[in-house]
C-alpha cells in the first residue's frame, strides 16, 4: 500500500466513538491470539503424529503406518487411505460427512488447512496483489493519528502553561516542517563524526523526568510531534532522568507506585512467576524513537513480488570455491575426523546436543574483554552493547541489523559459538533482578529493559568482589545469534539500565521463553553463574508493561525436547532414474569456471549409474530472523556419505520472505539401486547473512532409517515418519516423481527414538 492510502480520514468521529472502536479492535486482537494458539496446537499435534508414524514399509505393508498395529491376511487387513494411499487400520481412520474416510494424519492436515485459513490466503494471493497491512491496523492507525488542526489547538493550550515547553515543541514542529530535507544530511554528518568519537553526548536538562505510558495513543502522538527528528535522540539523553530508578524492595518508583515483585512458580527448567503489575514506562520516550525509526526501515525494505517462477538446475560438478560469507561458522571449527559426517555435521546445529565443556566461559570472557577495549578505542568490537547511562560511547557492529538498533540494543557477540555447556561454579544463588518488558506490534521489537539487580551473591570469595553482567536467550534457540549481553557492573547491587532487543513476530514470540541469567565475570578463570529466571511468553500480557522484580533461581539441568518444535514446512519432489533409463547428458561447469585451451576439444565422460533429481519447490512458515519479520533463505543439500564441498548444492537466495519459492533442481549422479538403502539426502535451510555467519532455519533428512550405511553405524541414518516414507516411496517407484511436504527439524542432531 502506498503511504497516502494507509490512513483513513476519521476526524469526524467523537472521542467516545473512537474509544468504542478501539475496544472492538482490542477484542479482535485478543481473539486472533487465541486462534493462533489453537492453530499452533494443531500444528504440534500434526507434527507429533507424523513423527510417531515410524517405519512405513515393514513386512510388505502388513502394519498400520500410524499406530504400527499388525494387520491380518484375511480379517482386519486394513485399507489404503484415499488421500495418501498408505495402509492404515480401522482405528486410524476419520470418516467424513459424505461417508468417505481419511487417515488421522490426512484428516489433521485438512482440518489445519481449513482452520488456519490457508486455503483462503492462497486464493486471495491468486486474485489480488500481496497486501502487508490488515484492515484493522489501518483503522487503528487512522484513529490514533493526530490531525494538523488538533495539534495546533494543543499547541495553543500548552503555550499558556509554560514558555519553555511550548518553545521546545514549536521548535521541533518547525524543524519537521521546514528542515526535513536537511535532516538526512545532518544525521549522516553526525554519524560520521560519531564514528571518530567527536560527538559528546548531552545531558538532560535540570534532571527532568519524562514518563510516557506505552499506550498506543500516547505513542502515536509522540511520533507526530517528533517525526522528523527521529534518530537524533540518543539513548543517553534519558540517563540522568533514569538515575536512581532501581528502587529497592519496599520503595516506590514511577511517581509513587510501588514496584511489585514476581515470585517465580515451578517450571520445566527453572521457575517463572505470577504477580501484579504497575503501569507506566519510564524509558518509553527512547523506545518510541526506536519504534519510529524501525518503522521507516521496515517500509523501505518491503519486497516487490516477482512474476512467473523460474527453475534453476545445479549439477554435481559445482565448484567448491565459495566466498567466505557463504561458509558456515562451524566450518572454521572443523576437525580432522574420519567419520563421514565431519564437515557436514558441523555445518548444522547438531552440536547443540553435545558437550562443549568450557567453550561458553571462554567466549564470554573474550566478548567482555573486547567490549571494554572498544569503549576506550572506539573500535568496531565484537559484542555491541550500548548502555542508556550518560556518557556511554556508541559502538557499532557490522552485524545485519537496522541502524536504529545501534543506539538502544545489546547485540550478540561475533566470537560466540554455543552457550550454557560449561561449569557453572558453586556460588549459592541469591538476589533479584528488575526488568521492564515491552513489545511493539508494528515493528516486531521485543524490548527487555534490564534496570538493576539486588542482593547478588559474591562471585569471587577471595577478593570479595562481584563483576556481574546479564545474558539472555529466547529459548529454545541458544545459538550465538540469539544471545544478548549487558556490560559488566561491579557490586552486589549493580545498575545496568540497558535495553536488550529482539526482532520477532508476535506469533513466534508466543512459542518462546525468555531466559535471563546473571554471571560473574572472571578475567583469568571461569565465569560463575549467579542465577537465572525464565519467562514464558505464551500468556504474557504486553498491553500494560511495568517494572517487575524476578527472584533469581539456580540452574536446572534438563535436556530440552526440541524434536517437536515447529520450524516450518518444506515441499520437495523426488525422482530416481535407474541406470538403464539414464539419458541425461553430463552437466556443464558453471560459468566463470571454464578453462579455454587450444587444441582438440575433449569429450566429457558420460554419467554412469542412476540419477537422483531433487526438486526444491517451496517452504512455508520459516522462522523470521530479520527486521520486519522476514528471512533471506536458501537451501543447501548433500547426498551422504559424500559430504565434499564439490558435491554440495545450493539454491538461489530468496530475500525478505518466510514463504520462499525456489523451484530449483538438485541432480546427484552415480547412484545405483543398491546405494539407495545406504545413502541419505540431507537438506538444510539457512538465512543468508552479509557480514556474519548464516543462520540455521531448519532441515530434513531422507533415508531408510536403518542407522547403518555400508555396514557401519552412523548417526545420520535416522529418518522416521514422513521423511522415511517419502524416501522409500521414491525407491519403490523408479522413474516416477513423488512429492511430499516435510516438517523441518529444529536441530540436525540424531533423532531420539
From Swiss-Prot:
Subcellular location: Membrane
Compositional bias segments (type: Low complexity): 224-238
GO biological process, one term: exocytosis
Gene3D superfamilies from the UniProt entry: C2 domain, Zinc/RING finger domain, C3HC4 (zinc finger)
Compositional bias per record (Polar residues), positions renumbered to this chain: 260-275, 305-316
Modification type Phosphoserine: residues: 147
GO cellular component: exocytic vesicle; plasma membrane
PROSITE patterns noted in UniProt: C2, RABBD
Pfam families assigned to the protein according to its UniProt record, in alphabetical order: C2, FYVE_2
Domain of life where this protein originates: Eukaryota
Chain spans, region Disordered: 145-188, 221-283, 298-359
Zinc finger residue extent: FYVE-type: 64-106
Keywords: Membrane, Metal-binding, Phosphoprotein, Repeat, Zinc, Zinc-finger
Residue spans crossing the bilayer: none
Primary location group: membrane
Purpose: May act as Rab effector protein and play a role in vesicle trafficking. Binds phospholipids.
Record note on quaternary structure: Binds RAB27A that has been activated by GTP-binding.
Name recorded for this polypeptide: Synaptotagmin-like protein 5
Organism the protein comes from: Rattus norvegicus
Native organism taxonomy: Eukaryota, Metazoa, Chordata, Craniata, Vertebrata
Amino acid at each position: 500500500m502506498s503511504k497516502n492510502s494507509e490512513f483513513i480520514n476519521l476526524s469526524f468521529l467523537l472521542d467516545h466513538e473512537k474509544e468504542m472502536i478501539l475496544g472492538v479492535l482490542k477484542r479482535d486482537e485478543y481473539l486472533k491470539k487465541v486462534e493462533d494458539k489453537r492453530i499452533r496446537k494443531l500444528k504440534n499435534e500434526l507434527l507429533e503424529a507424523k513423527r510417531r508414524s515410524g517405519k512405513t514399509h515393514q513386512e510388505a505393508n502388513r502394519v498400520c503406518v500410524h499406530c504400527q498395529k499388525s494387520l491380518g491376511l484375511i480379517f482386519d487387513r486394513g485399507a489404503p487411505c484415499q488421500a495418501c494411499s498408505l495402509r492404515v487400520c480401522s482405528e486410524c481412520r476419520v470418516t467424513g460427512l459424505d461417508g468417505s474416510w481419511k487417515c488421522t494424519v490426512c484428516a489433521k492436515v485438512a482440518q489445519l488447512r481449513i482452520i488456519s485459513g490457508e486455503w483462503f490466503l492462497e486464493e486471495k494471493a491468486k486474485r489480488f496483489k500481496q497486501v502487508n497491512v490488515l484492515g484493522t491496523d489501518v483503522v487503528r492507525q487512522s484513529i490514533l493519528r493526530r490531525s494538523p488542526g488538533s495539534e495546533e489547538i494543543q499547541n495553543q493550550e500548552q503555550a499558556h502553561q509554560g514558555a519553555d515547553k511550548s518553545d521546545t515543541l514549536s521548535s521541533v514542529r518547525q524543524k519537521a516542517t521546514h528542515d526535513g530535507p536537511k535532516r538526512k544530511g545532518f544525521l549522516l554528518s553526525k554519524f560520521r563524526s560519531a564514528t571518530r568519537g567527536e560527538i559528546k553526548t548531552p545531558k538532560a536538562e535540570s534532571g527532568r523526568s519524562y514518563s510516557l505510558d506505552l499506550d498506543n495513543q500516547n505513542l502515536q502522538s509522540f511520533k507526530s510531534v517528533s517525526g522528523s527528528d527521529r534518530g537524533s535522540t540518543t539513548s543517553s539523553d534519558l540517563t540522568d532522568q533514569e538515575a536512581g530508578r532501581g528502587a529497592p524492595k519496599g520503595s516506590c518508583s514511577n511517581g509513587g507506585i510501588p514496584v511489585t515483585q514476581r515470585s517465580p512458580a515451578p517450571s520445566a527448567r527453572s521457575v517463572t512467576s505470577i504477580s501484579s503489575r504497575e503501569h507506566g514506562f519510564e524509558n518509553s520516550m527512547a523506545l518510541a524513537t526506536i519504534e519510529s525509526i524501525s518503522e521507516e526501515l521496515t517500509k523501505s525494505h518491503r519486497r516487490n513480488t516477482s512474476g512467473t517462477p523460474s527453475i534453476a538446475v545445479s549439477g554435481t560438478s559445482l565448484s567448491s570455491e565459495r566466498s567466505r560469507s557463504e561458509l558456515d561458522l562451524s566450518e572454521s571449527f572443523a576437525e580432522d575426523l574420519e567419520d563421514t559426517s565431519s564437515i557436514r555435521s558441523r555445518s548444522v546445529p547438531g552440536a547443540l546436543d553435545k558437550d562443549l565443556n568450557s567453550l561458553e566461559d571462554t567466549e564470554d570472557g573474550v566478548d567482555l574483554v573486547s567490549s571494554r577495549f572498544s569503549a576506550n578505542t572506539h573500535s568496531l568490537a565484537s559484542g555491541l552493547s550500548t548502555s542508556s547511562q550518560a556518557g556511554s560511547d556508541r559502538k557499532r557492529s557490522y552485524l545485519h541489523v537496522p541502524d536504529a538498533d545501534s543506539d538502544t540494543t545489546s547485540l550478540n557477540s561475533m566470537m560466540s559459538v554455543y552457550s550454557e555447556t560449561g561449569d557453572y561454579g558453586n556460588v549459592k544463588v541469591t538476589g533479584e533482578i528488575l526488568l521492564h518488558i515491552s513489545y511493539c506490534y508494528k515493528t516486531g521489537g521485543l524490548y527487555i529493559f534490564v534496570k538493576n539487580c539486588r542482593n547478588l551473591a559474591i562471585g569471587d570469595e577471595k577478593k570479595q568482589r562481584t563483576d556481574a553482567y546479564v545474558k539472555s536467550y529466547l529459548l529454545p534457540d541458544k545459538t550465538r545469534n540469539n544471545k544478548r549481553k549487558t556490560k559488566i557492573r561491579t557490586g552486589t547491587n549493580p545498575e545496568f539500565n540497558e535495553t536488550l532487543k529482539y526482532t520477532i513476530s508476535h506469533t513466534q514470540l508466543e512459542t518462546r521463553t525468555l531466559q535471563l541469567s546473571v554471571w560473574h565475570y572472571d578475567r583469568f578463570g571461569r565465569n560463575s553463574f549467579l542465577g537465572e529466571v525464565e519467562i514464558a511468553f505464551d500468556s504474557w500480557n504486553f498491553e500494560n508493561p511495568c517494572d517487575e522484580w524476578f527472584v533469581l533461581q539456580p540452574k536446572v539441568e534438563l535436556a530440552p525436547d526440541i524434536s517437536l518444535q515447529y520450524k516450518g514446512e518444506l515441499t520437495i519432489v523426488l525422482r530416481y532414474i535407474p541406470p538403464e533409463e539414464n539419458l541425461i547428458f553430463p552437466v556443464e561447469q558453471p560459468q566463470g569456471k571454464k578453462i579455454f585451451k587450444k587444441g582438440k576439444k575433449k569429450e566429457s565422460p558420460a554419467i554412469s549409474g542412476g540419477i537422483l533429481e531433487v526438486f526444491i519447490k517451496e517452504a512455508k512458515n520459516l522462522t523470521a530472523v530479520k527486521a520486519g519479520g522476514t528471512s533471506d533463505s536458501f537451501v543447501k543439500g548433500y547426498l551422504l556419505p559424500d559430504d565434499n564441498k564439490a558435491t554440495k548444492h545450493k539454491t538461489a537466495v530468496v530475500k525478505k520472505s518466510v514463504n520462499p519459492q525456489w523451484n530449483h533442481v538438485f541432480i546427484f549422479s552415480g547412484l545405483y539401486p543398491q546405494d539407495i538403502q545406504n545413502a541419505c539426502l540431507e537438506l538444510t535451510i539457512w538465512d543468508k547473512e552479509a557480514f556474519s555467519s548464516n543462520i540455521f532455519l531448519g532441515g530434513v533428512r531422507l533415508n531408510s532409517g536403518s542407522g547403518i550405511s555400508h555396514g557401519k553405524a552412523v548417526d545420520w541414518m535416522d529418518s522416521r515418519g514422513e521423511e522415511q516414507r517419502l524416501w522409500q516411496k521414491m525407491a519403490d517407484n523408479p522413474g516416477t516423481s513423488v512429492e511430499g511436504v516435510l516438517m523441518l527439524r529444529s536441530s540436525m542432531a540424531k533423532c531420539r527414538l
